[in-house]
Structures are given as structure tokens and as C-alpha cells.
Amino acid sequence: MARLRRWHCYRKLEVPYTRVSRSKNKNYIPGAKPTMVRLFHMGELTRNPSEWQYEASLVAKENHQIRDNAIEAIRVMVNKYLESTLGKKRYLFIIRKYPHHIYREKPVVGGYAGADRISQGMRLSFGRPKGRAVQIYEGEKLLSIFFDDITKAKDIKYFLQVARSKLPWRYREEIVEVKSGKPLAL
């Protein structure tokens, strides 16, 4: 069974590798997979973010990369929690980062006799495109939840803590008033 390589190989930032085009002659990266994140805006889509009273966000504490299937897992989980506690029309959930970066993997042959005849070592060791990742920098918001009901702020903070536990590296939760920008003390 094919497995994903452990993410500690990729989570440090590198030069973005992103040139994908619909026309074949302009496409520098052949065989790049599409992103696994299907929706970036969920909930009440008719209201602008500035029309809500409160914003809860996950803010990165360090520069790093996140695989797109980790973001998709967080999206599904947080959206399910928000729908069950707040209802479909009482929040706006936005994923603020798009997985542009395409990470590569050089398959390592080993474990059987004659592997040295098959692999070329480090000659032309660029690797093949395996998936997409988000490159996020310190202080940037990965996702935001907009809401009006202050009594649900502790629930939303808990949802962000659960989402944070599924991500690599470190984040902090921020809940602020949209109009004034003042942080809420919970």
C-alpha cells in the first residue's frame, strides 16, 4: 500500500515551486496534482467579513509548510462542529491560504538485492511532484471564523484548539472584535 512520506521531511520552508499552467508548453511542472482543499469559504456567504461582530483566527507562530490534506481534514472537522453548534447561517468560515507550493519526492529504492543498479543515487535527484502544500509565515492567519454570538466564543476557541492539534508546528488562537480590533479576554 502506498503511504505518504513523513511530513518532517518537508515542513521547513523552501523556494516556492509553483509554475503550473493549463497550456502544456507553459507548464514547468508536469504531473502536478490538484489541491485537496475543495472549499475555502463556508457558512453564511452573503455577508462580508466586515459585517460580523467577532473574528476567531489561527495565527502561525513560525514559518513552515502544511500539506493540503491536513488543511482539508481541519476544514471538514471545524465546519462540522460549527454547523452543529451554531447552525448553517450563523458563521462565516474562511481558509485564508491556498496550497500553491508543489512538493516533490525522490523515491528511495532499498531493502532488496540489486537496488544500486536501479537507483542512480543523488544524480538528478529532483524528485517527482507528489502533492501540494501551503507556505505560511509568522503572524499570518491560516483560517478565520466570523460570528455574532459572544456566548459561543468559548466553543469556537475550543474548535480552534482541536484544529491546532492536527497541524504541524505552533499556532495561537486569536478572538477579536471586527470593528475595533480589540482582543477578547476569555
From Swiss-Prot:
PROSITE patterns: RIBOSOMAL_L10E. It comes from the Archaea. One of its GO terms (cellular component) is ribonucleoprotein complex. One of its GO terms (biological process) is translation. Pfam families: Ribosomal_L16. Keywords: Ribonucleoprotein, Ribosomal protein. Belongs to the universal ribosomal protein uL16 family. NCBIfam families: PRK04199.1-4. This is Large ribosomal subunit protein uL16. It comes from Nanoarchaeum equitans (strain Kin4-M).
